[in-house]
Amino acid sequence: MLDLIATRRALHQIPELGMEEFKTHAFLMETIEGLLQDCSFAQVRTWKTGILVYLTGSAPEKTIGWRADIDGLPIVEETGLDFKSLHPDRMHACGHDFHMTIALGLLEKMAEQQPRNNLLFLFQPAEENLAGGMLMYEAGAFGDWLPDEFYGLHVRPDLKVGQMATNRATLFAGTCEVKIRFTGKGGHAAFPYTANDALVAASYFVTQVQSVVSRNVDPIEGAVVTFGSMHAGTTNNVIAETAFLHGTIRALTQNMSLLVQKRVREVAEGIALSFGVDLEIELNPSGYLPVENNPQLADELMTYFDGIDGVEMIDCPPAMTGEDFGYLLNKVPGVMFWLGVDTPYPLHNPRLSPKEEVLPFAVDKLSDFLKMKAN
């Protein structure tokens, strides 16, 4: 029987960045092979560092998918745990070690007896940085194993063990990375009329772009435009020839994201025209679309867990965090939900330490749900 605590701790010690999860891949493959050694209805495929495990049903009418992400973050761990990260400047600070462990536990349970419907377990790389779900889909990694329904979870620090949360609409925002460069003409600070100051243009842009959310976005729908980085100039007495800005757009629907992207571009173009500077702009939504739950499947999941002892199912509002599972849910109907892990530190914090007691709880409750779906 899989030791959930030991498995999680082993995975916690080897966090790796997206598409570099080589030790993680090897550990998962070894564990999966052990779990499936007596299973005659299982097949395994790999795609780079990703892994797909397919359980063939006895009389399949559909395929049910379960997804777990496997990558870590470029964070120096500060938990002080005996099993802290062995990789410098790398940490499982978003709970993906928990996601993998739960998926392995579910695989073990579901491989005990052949289900009626097919089951796919996806161990997906590069959630944090490269939208690995999109990469796998576009590369054809699923083939004829593409699920008819897809499910996935994310740990949530501010919920207690036993609490789960989701909704029947959008759970996470879609994100879009924004890169902007204004190019003017450098010169001596004493003679600004002989130059064209890119820093001034960029400063006006940062101010003007605030109107996009306040004047173009329905406040009931909501959106975020944040520029967290601006770099211009080299010293105090030289007028900046270039100014670079790096920001993010977040919205709860793809239509709203496209509207905000359009307005950010228009504001940047207007600033460039009015100041007579050149503009380069890159809007990159990549694979981080809004995580839009299928209403019927979400209602089924929420109703199911409402009737399960020991589970408190919460109907929660959406969050502006991003998740690349949104790309897969744009292709396949499904549901994502929060799983409470009761820790005072937020996701991506160097002290994040979820409660391990959630592991047997999650495997027990979620395996029953999967058995219901697969039979």
From Swiss-Prot:
The keyword Amino-acid biosynthesis applies. Transmembrane segments: none annotated. InterPro entries: AcetylDAP_deacetylase, Amidohydrolase, Bact_exopeptidase_dim_dom, Peptidase_M20, Peptidase_M20_dimer. It catalyses: N-acetyl-(2S,6S)-2,6-diaminopimelate + H2O = (2S,6S)-2,6-diaminopimelate + acetate. NCBIfam families: amidohydrolases. GO terms for biological process: diaminopimelate biosynthetic process; lysine biosynthetic process via diaminopimelate. SUPFAM superfamilies: Bacterial exopeptidase dimerisation domain, Zn-dependent exopeptidases. It is an enzyme of class 3 (hydrolase). The lineage of its organism: Bacteria, Bacillati, Bacillota, Bacilli, Lactobacillales. Keywords: Amino-acid biosynthesis, Diaminopimelate biosynthesis, Hydrolase, Lysine biosynthesis. Pathway: Amino-acid biosynthesis; L-lysine biosynthesis via DAP pathway; LL-2,6-diaminopimelate from (S)-tetrahydrodipicolinate (acetylase route): step 3/3. This is N-acetyldiaminopimelate deacetylase. Its EC number is 3.5.1.47. Catalyzes the conversion of N-acetyl-diaminopimelate to diaminopimelate and acetate. Belongs to the peptidase M20A family. N-acetyldiaminopimelate deacetylase subfamily. The keyword Cell inner membrane does not apply.
